Amino acid sequence: MFITLEGGEGVGKTTQQALLAERLQREGYACVSTREPGGTALGEALRELLLHGDPLTPLAELLLYAADRAEHVNKVIAPALAVGQVVICDRFTDSTLAYQGYGRGLNLEQIRQLNHLATGGLQPQLTLWLDLAPEVGLARSRLGDKLEQEHLEFHRRVYRGFQALAAAEPQRIVRIDAGGSPLEVAARIWSVVKPRLLAAVPRP
């Protein structure tokens, strides 16, 4: 089963990914935790460039994310899924649509086509959208990378993008209230993941 975590800056994706992986392992499931950008040697190099390097044009940024994704799917995600592991990925194609499409203003249909090319058509079975107002998420976040330093209106556009994506695919993208303590959010996530997991993956 392929699960992705999505959301704006400071929503707690990294924490929730770790808590979900721990829960899955306790329940006896083999799982792989990975992230975008990143997840491979090329991906980690691109991550440094994308998040901490000199400013890029929106198109160059988009193409680097696509290169990262193509390598990531081929070397990490698809092989893990092929042997029956649960894959939990911090960001995937929805982030590209939200950030480069809604945030940067690039053409959404062209981004979808590029995503399809990079992934070979692979889509998550479940996407957990951690929903938190941009103002709250930015106040929480301390990393200070290039995305977090964008102006508030950019993050509001990204947020509206995630809202639109969730509205368009309600069966795949499930809104999770990201307010409250990490354990409270983790409980909300597990209440969504557990029935989907039991339906998709045989009990170990």
Swiss-Prot record:
Keyword Mitochondrion: no
Name of the gene this protein is made from: tmk
UniProt-recorded Gene Ontology molecular function terms: ATP binding; dTMP kinase activity
Catalysed reactions, as listed in the record: dTMP + ATP = dTDP + ADP
EC number per UniProt: 2.7.4.9
PROSITE patterns attached to this UniProt entry: THYMIDYLATE_KINASE
Protein name: Thymidylate kinase
Cellular component annotations (GO), alphabetically ordered: cytosol
